């Protein structure tokens, strides 16, 4: 009975234990249900606090019987459970209601970058495949999506560039301050709430705000540069191509369309060079250093072009040197903006204010009644002489001209060339691009006098007059040089043979025939977008009578003029064939009646010109910061094709010159390996130096790239390294100068003196022969002759040369037994030479790095070789295929093996032998036959 009662008590205890476990489980479930219900009804801090309080109450009532230590442990567990339930509101996946609630509260979303769209990754997608699909690089996708790894999972949403939006508009969200970044995972966000106290205070998910100085705002490091350049070859012309510069290599690929590439092939011009072989890199503004690359330092001229370094680089403060590249970019950008504003601002001496410009009136140029020609009369100024008053028409044109379209203009250069540039700009004030044209008359003082150049483009001609004095003329040219140097437009150079006017006060205007200019006029007048032809007849003419102009130095230029709305001509004076120009006075332009064989003979052209200018006078608004566009043409004596702007876009500014000095010649990227080696050996004597013409716009990029990736290379000279490169020929010349005996006069000597001198000079030669003599053999060999010994001694390894040879074993003395050979070689500790003579009197053998001995495996090193004198002396060294050098057995001795064949095999009696071709030495058969009979055998050691 007692046992039954004890069993019942134990059973009750067990039930109470499981009951307690069940109660704990129910308590946890109830706590979760309460927290979920409270999260639906409440939000924010109240939810967290209510959940915590309810759970605390429930747990206290359920666990009241336990000790204080258990309460402390349970309390810590409760805090952990609280933290988990709190975070379940944000990371719950199964509960749809919680998910919708989370979407409302969760603000940790990545801002969508501009110009991108969302793409959901599939099961087969990788970052590389997605990048290839949208034509971007994987690194760009990582940067756009703020990824921490290149691994993506199916269903992941990525931002990819939108094909409908240009790539230039794509901006990263990190570039704007305050952009939020998504967490990498839920675990990362979970770690941001370490305990329940922070969970109570968490009103919303934690988000990371990027500051404007964050590292992610900085653009990625430039890993390579790609630019168009021209390569100056060594006597094979100048070739255009693409240069790619990386931190490890410099490559140049020529354009396939280049004439030299078409003629000679791309193998001659493709280059590649590792950055480790580059000795020096330098940028110059001219090629003066190219001409003196082989000159001695003492012969260098003093006016060499200095090494290029940005001006702002030296002005950087110490705090900016921490990251000089980004600071330099910002400084350079500010300078470019200032230069752009300076080009828009005109000189106060040559441009009037808007208040002063209101005094200007419209002046018409009216053709005579009896002719359709323009006639030139004396120019009269309302203010007196034009030399004393400012050039009113010039000022009006400067203020009135607007960058309305691409206009072709010839600008005077510094010395003896004319630049033909194509100025591109945006239309303003509702002016049509087709209304931009030019006509100009300019001087040719040194040749035949002034010539007329007229050009029209895209349907309309705008004409104006400009009166300039000598001073204003020079100011205008300076302003033009400044403006055109700042532009990035085409400027092919054209030769001319005329100089600047020297005595403008006494000059006269004469119109002469010029066939090239007439062709130019006809080309531009016929170049209409609608296909209409403005000028139909362009005839050759020469004006014999020359009208003199009132003194004052006048340069008449017909240019486009856009007057203000208030300066429009009177309504009653709108006549066909009348051209209105801006000016301070009436300037009638007429030609001499004797010149009736004309330059322009079409009244319809004049009517269209007048009507178009009349409309523009009403519609156009004048801008006081407009640029001036003039034609300063002296004389064109080149074909018309040479002065027309080319289709490909070129930089107007002159290029910079990149000089790359390398340790050895660059490799030809398109040539074969053999041709490349021949080319390198052929040019080894020359100083390897390569020159490239690079655009000036990319010079700062090149400089920054080289300073960043190879700071020790840029600007380093050979003399800074402690040595001067001297060609081999110069060294030979110096050596020969001191080695050759000095020239002496003829002298007669006796025979005894001649013999004495001969014996004295040959003393050292005999000593050298003794030094290079045969090694000492102890005793004399019965098989080897001096010829054999000499040839063998030359092929022995260096560690045994010079030692006397000692005979260790000979069949004549010790008998024919392999065991005896092993016994005699046991005391040796040096390489041995095996010499065999067969019954055919053929001598052959082997050199072994170790003495012959009994062994269970092959031994020896790669210095082991086989040799034969049958019929000529040959040595077969180790091929490297295997290491079967020497193997000593009781029944045989083997040297070389592989494939069941031995290079040299001897039996136990040293009587029979065999020689085959083996893979160890790739040797021939050493004897005349594969099987041979040994006549004599010797083993020599070196001591």
UniProtKB/Swiss-Prot annotation:
Keywords: Acetylation, Activator, Coiled coil, Nucleus, Phosphoprotein, Transcription, Transcription regulation
UniProt keyword Cell cycle present: no
GO molecular function term, any single one: nuclear receptor binding
Modification type N-acetylmethionine: residues: 1
Keyword match Transcription: yes
Domain TLDc: 782-943
Domain LysM: 117-160
Coiled coil regions in record: 1-32
Localization (cell): Nucleus
Compositionally biased spans, kind Polar residues: 177-187
Modified residue annotations for Phosphoserine: 92, 182, 186, 211-212, 214, 442, 498, 500
Region (Disordered): 1-83, 169-189, 334-369, 486-507, 543-576
Tissue localization of expression: Highly expressed in brain and kidney. Weakly expressed in mammary gland, lung and testis. In brain, expression is found in neurons of cerebral cortex, thalamus, hypothalamus, hippocampus, cerebellum, striatum and choroid plexus.
Highest taxon, organism lineage: Eukaryota
Database matches in Pfam families: LysM, TLD
Ranges of Basic and acidic residues composition bias in the record: 1-15, 349-369, 486-499
Residue positions where Phosphothreonine is found in the record: 137
Gene Ontology cellular component annotations, sorted alphabetically: nucleus
Functional summary from the UniProt entry: Enhances the transcriptional activities of several nuclear receptors. Involved in the coactivation of different nuclear receptors, such as ESR1, THRB, PPARG and RARA.
Family: Belongs to the OXR1 family.
PANTHER family linked to this entry: NUCLEAR RECEPTOR COACTIVATOR 7, NUCLEOLAR PROTEIN 7/ESTROGEN RECEPTOR COACTIVATOR-RELATED
The protein's name: Nuclear receptor coactivator 7
Gene that specifies this protein: Ncoa7
